[in-house]
């Protein structure tokens, strides 16, 4: 498919072969929960949409919530430990709503997590399937000419872009590396991350656990997927990531790499929360995300514009000449305007794999990829400390 070649293989400095994400097969009963979407708000209300496979009439779905920290059961507002939803029809989608008492909301300062458990009971009273996922009770909202809100409080993202990259594995990463990266980003006093494609899910798990908000993006740089491929990949991305509390925004491609025909699919698949979707480096959907604005360009966008301003790339850190250099001047001035919603520095780490075919050198593809605020093995550069001090 030419659009895949354009959107992916021409969209990065490094291309690797093979399978570098987990792949598995799952055996399921004939009637089962195929997919479920959650919306847990900061007041304790939990909406659940469950897509059933097979005729589930006569089955029951049982929902319970426990604390991830100590495993204690969370009670509903009427003192019950579970919510039972009898399936009285053959509809594919089953909607379940309830309210849970005394929850602690998820936030960047206090990323409190719970585990939601869904059990499917057949007409004979036997549990035939159990699904669990971690959740955070939080509310994400976007208001035009205002900004992004988390739990009713305006959020200014102090963000950085991150490639999924390791010296020895290329695009193959590990949970340990994801944890290291998330901790280093938190140590820079940052609260947000963006990437050019859906990351390994264990990185989203770390963002959930450590309190980093995330911009989840469909791949595509300057060239987008065609509608057939794009629709499939939007569906797969959102269905995989939709229940992560860290995700606050969706991105459709990068710097022209979007297909507007797939834009409506984001709200369709994020059916309960309908989080805001943007086009990086564009005035789109009430959000100005233009990249690499100069100091005065940024000021002019506030003075003459009316859209929320959130550059999804700025302060390019090539050879550490950007990143923290001049950040205080930019940040302090831009923060004086209520339209400023924060931004994302380019980029987190140098992408330099160890080349076994070149004597073991770390190859950053000349000047294309040594653009991180940390080195390829996560060595702290000058910008790391400057950003941390901001």
PLM region spans:
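Secreted/periplasmic carbohydrate-active enzymes, especially glycoside hydrolases
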Residues: 1-201, 205-209, 214, 232-236, ...
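Substrate-binding/catalytic cleft of secreted carbohydrate-active enzymes
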Residues: 176, 182-187, 191-382
């Amino acid at each position: 498919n030419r659009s895949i070649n354009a959107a992916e293989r021409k969209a990065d400095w490094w291309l690797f072969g093979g399978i570098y994400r987990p792949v598995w097969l799952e055996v399921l009963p004939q009637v089962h929960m195929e997919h479920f979407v959650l919306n847990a708000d900061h007041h304790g209300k939990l909406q659940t949409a469950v897509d059933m496979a097979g005729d589930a009439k006569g089955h029951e779905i049982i929902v319970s919530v426990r604390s991830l920290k100590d495993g204690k059961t969370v009670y509903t507002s009427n003192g019950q430990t579970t919510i039972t939803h009898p399936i009285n029809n053959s509809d594919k989608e089953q909607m379940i709503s309830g309210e849970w008492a005394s929850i602690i909301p998820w936030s960047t300062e206090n990323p409190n997590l719970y585990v939601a458990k869904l059990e499917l009971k057949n007409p004979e009273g036997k549990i035939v399937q159990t699904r669990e996922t971690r959740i955070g009770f939080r509310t994400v909202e976007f208001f035009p000419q205002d900004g992004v809100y988390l739990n009713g409080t305006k959020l200014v993202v102090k963000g950085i872009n991150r490639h999924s990259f390791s010296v020895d594995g290329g695009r193959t990463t590990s949970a340990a590396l994801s944890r290291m990266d998330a901790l280093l980003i938190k140590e820079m006093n940052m609260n947000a991350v963006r990437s050019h494609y859906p990351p390994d899910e264990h990185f989203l798990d770390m963002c959930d656990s450590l309190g980093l908000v995330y911009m989840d993006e469909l791949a595509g740089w300057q060239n987008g997927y065609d509608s057939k491929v794009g629709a499939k990949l939007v569906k797969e991305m959102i269905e995989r990531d939709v229940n992560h509390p860290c995700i606050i925004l969706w991105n459709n491609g990068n710097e022209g790499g979007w297909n507007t025909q797939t834009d409506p699919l984001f709200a369709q698949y994020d059916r309960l929360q309908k989080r805001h979707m943007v086009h990086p480096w564009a005035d789109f959907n009430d959000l100005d995300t233009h990249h690499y604005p100069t100091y005065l360009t940024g000021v002019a966008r506030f003075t003459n514009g009316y859209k929320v301003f959130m550059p999804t790339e700025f302060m390019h850190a090539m050879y550490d000449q950007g990143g923290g250099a001049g950040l205080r001047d930019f940040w302090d001035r831009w923060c004086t305007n209520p339209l400023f919603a924060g931004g994302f520095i380019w980029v987190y780490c140098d992408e330099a794999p160890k080349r076994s075919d070149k004597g073991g050198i770390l190859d950053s593809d000349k000047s294309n990829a040594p653009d991180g605020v940390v080195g390829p093995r996560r060595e702290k550069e000058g910008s790391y400390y400057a950003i941390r001090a901001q």
